[in-house]
Amino acid sequence: MYAVIATGGKQYRVEKDEVLRLEKLPGQVGDTVSFDQILLFSDGESVSVGTPVLGNVTVSGKIVEQDRAKKILVFKTKRRKRYRRKQGHRQSFTAVRIETIQAG
């Protein structure tokens, strides 16, 4: 059994007990989150595709971590002009363990 959800501008294929690293969601570690944009659902026998979303399927999970990813460096330069700019960035993310996928 799996579903395709949309959150944070991206789409994820999720299964029960899977841990996902999503774009930052509000909430503390241990809070329950539910996803309302379910694009596709499969129970192993049949596949339901939303137009664009399914209304009778719910996916919920529990926040297991709120953290920031590793730092990436952005370095800009212009040749022969001594122009150099170095900038770092760390993206915030939320790790969510999928607990239930229910159709009904």
UniProtKB/Swiss-Prot annotation:
Pfam families in alphabetical order: Ribosomal_L21p
Example GO BP: translation
GO cellular component terms listed in the entry, alphabetical order: cytoplasm; ribonucleoprotein complex; ribosome
Keyword check for Ribonucleoprotein: yes
GO molecular function, one term: rRNA binding
Highest taxon of source: Bacteria
Record keywords: Ribonucleoprotein, Ribosomal protein, RNA-binding, rRNA-binding
The keyword Ribonucleoprotein is annotated on this UniProt entry: yes
PROSITE patterns the record matches: RIBOSOMAL_L21 (PS01169)
Subunit structure: Part of the 50S ribosomal subunit. Contacts protein L20.
Protein purpose: This protein binds to 23S rRNA in the presence of protein L20.
Family indicated by similarity: Belongs to the bacterial ribosomal protein bL21 family.
Protein name: Large ribosomal subunit protein bL21
